[in-house]
Amino acid sequence: MATISDVAKRAGVSVMTVSRVINKSARVSDDMIERVNRAISELNYRPNMVARGLATRHTHMIAYVFSNLANPFFAAVSMGIQNACAEKGYTMILFDITSAERFNECLDTLIDRRIDGVVFHHLDVRQENVDSLRSNGVCVATIDNEVDLEGVTSVNGDDYEAARMATRHLIDRGYRRIGCVHEQYEDRSDENRGKKDYIQLFQRRIWKNRTRGFLDEMRSASLEPVCMIEGSGTADIAFAEDKESLQRILAPENRPCALYCENDIIALAVLSESMRQGIRVPQEIAIIGHDGLDYGMMLYPRLTTVCQPRYEMGSLVAHRLIDTIEHKSENEIIFTHSAVVAGDTT
């Protein structure tokens, strides 16, 4: 197995120069970089990442921490993070958080393993968590965190404006009897923690902003919602299996002409039940979702949805986090922009 000394000898440079090229820790001429990289390739040299971490005080590892591996929303985000990490020479590791205990274990692991940075997604990270991580050398970024934080880079979806956009799409197509399927809005106080499934404690901010956007756009058109229906579970797979709620939405006496669903899995569940009952879409009920999951475009009729740039969110947050780790930028708050993708359901 080749060593760093072998690389230095083959390239005709010092071991220190090879180390500087590998770690990008100092200015080295282009000629030196080319010679070292050629020697590395010829010898099939693989740097010792543990030793590299000790030398540079960086492990070149980024953690992506989220709360529901079964939710397809996270796949494109993780791909964006993964590709950005690979581009910059970092490795991504995943944590699927399913309990408060698991969250605390995750925080300890991030510190113990000297992870350079972490992206928390759709969680309720608190300021004390951030302060603890940063004091131990872990940089922090978030996507759609429940509360605003200091000392982090935040990438957030434009949930309020996107919901208005979805509602305006329905109104512009002549629909007036419009309803909404929203999520639960329990108080986020600490005494409520542990009383419900851990995952259900999060994403309240998202649902509130989407509902507020829907209601404000309806009011701007001098319209009142036909119905405001609260989804069950976590507004994903659990709701899709809740036949009672679906049948209540689609009952002839309650059925709106159009329905804004606050995520795509709810929308696909409503679409599936409509097709099962023989209800014509969009002739008898129009449906628009929110998020832009690939599933919606694979089916027929194709789901009309507000598409969030999920891959771009992941790529953006990872690049900004790595820049922070490498002291190339300060923390910032960034809002992404969604767009309506018209399918066959409106």
Where is each model-derived feature located?
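N-terminal helix-turn-helix DNA-binding module of bacterial transcription factors
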Residues: 1-59
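Bacterial carbohydrate/catabolite-sensing allosteric modules
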Residues: 42, 83-93, 134-142, 146-346
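Alpha-helical recognition/docking segments in bacterial nutrient-uptake
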Residues: 2-5, 57-172, 251-254
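Generic recognition of short, well-ordered alpha-helical segments
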Residues: 49, 75-76, 105, 272, ...
